[in-house]
């Protein structure tokens, strides 16, 4: 009996040990495989493999795990070169990432492991800007990017990094003023900024509980705040500090807080009553000007204060029921495109201009979104005609973007950053600066073959390509600029004073976007898969009509899990070779879910059952009672229940797990049109416009 009991215990222990030795998460293995290859497969990383393997069980060099998850990468001093790989965001359990004291070059990756607490890329040869993506990594406690070749201004991106205790940007080539969001670093203890080119004052630091501050050898000026003079370790030499007595701060002025009336927000640095009076007078004048502007225009250019329902704009929308026949448009995205060749014999779709030509082009062709030409453009039906793509000079784009300054940064993704380009005559464009490492350095064509294909894509719900720039190793695409921003901003980044999108507008956005995707899938030959459909790539024009962006760049999206982010990627798309147009349909269904619920596709801060929007919402899509509970609270119930139910039915079809059960986009468009037609007969005479004097919510 005793022997049997002993054997039972031994077997149980063996089973327990086997369960504990769980294989490393597949996505994390893939991320490390790609990283190993990108680092040029260094022999010093013992155990690492280019394909497969088990980092946790096989104890790969520098890899530490907890259970089946990789939690630390300690790779300091391995003389590593190359790049870091493009799947780092798959390492969701990683808390420590140390690549210090290596020979790494190029830009810091845009997409880093999202839950890092300690990031150390110091003592390398990294250049470019500090990535804005750091602003979303709320768990960061330590950032060390010292002793590299980083340049440009620091983005104002530190608002959410309240846990950050150590920040080291020393020995780089960073410039400009300190960002005002430094004031939000309430846990900061150590700040090293020495040996850079920072300017302005350091007043933004005065309310922080820092005990180790080094700002030596910069171009700071003004005075060292008294609050900082008692710091145990304070180094301030090599700057242009004022030798005069520092003036006392004016009553009520708090340094280190962003002022609503000042971009710098650093407070008043002069101590005279004249300056104080002047500042007060300036604020008063600004208030008067703002009141005058508000009185003159009921509708602001801001996306958050547009009066959709009482707008008096002339109707500018194509009839929602006017589906039309899809004309075939030949677009070369085939093998020739992949090889850097164009299917056309010439470059008749590309028009080169210099500075003078650019001025004429911006003045005559890129009209503002309130003029007659743009109104006519909105009413234009599908066309297979092409429009010349203008070749911009690098110097012109550098001037219009202030040398691609962080202040003009609109956003960034897995293949590059988008900047606002402002011209002296008031016109504005959007410039997508694509990562140069994505192009084969051995080929001279650069971005030209892509431009040849993109210039053929024309649809009223697709953001138009204006031109491009391929010069000195830079590859950029120039698009229309939309002041209203993206659907993502409207749904997820609005404040409590914002006017939410009405139900009618949400339906219109869904239908317009569906038509854009249908055009890519079924009017273009061969079919164009988007591979990056998400709310941040759906821009909204002056009248809140959708314009799909980032199309025709699928060659750069080797793994859609990298660029789409969590929540949008279709289940089958984990295997890049399995991506089909039906995978685009799934992503579009997720966007419709965002319109319905107002939630983001994945929210790691919610309880586990609610983190994935699709998994949480899908079981409730066919329950009419549950639908009212998951509908966006910002709608305040102002929607017809039948319309909500039909909208949910379409979503349920789009997000089917098996791609063969999802409808093609043409059927999605037809379903949305039928939904509009069946919901209210009153829409027959009003389908040409989505604006009415009184919105009856009858979709």
Swiss-Prot record:
Residues 295-699 are cytoplasmic. It is found in: Membrane. The keyword Metal-binding does not apply. The keyword Repeat applies. Expressed in leaves and flowers. GO terms for cellular component: membrane. InterPro entries: Kinase-like_dom_sf, Leu-rich_rpt, Leu-rich_rpt_typical-subtyp, LRR_dom_sf, LRR_N_plant-typ, PRK1-6/SRF4-like, Prot_kinase_dom. Coiled coil: none annotated. Pfam families: LRR_1 (PF00560), LRR_8 (PF13855), LRRNT_2 (PF08263), Pkinase (PF00069). Belongs to the protein kinase superfamily. Ser/Thr protein kinase family. Cannot functionally replace STRUBBELIG. Over-expression of SRF5 led to male-sterility in cv. Columbia but not in cv. Landsberg. This is Protein STRUBBELIG-RECEPTOR FAMILY 5. It comes from Arabidopsis thaliana. The gene is SRF5.
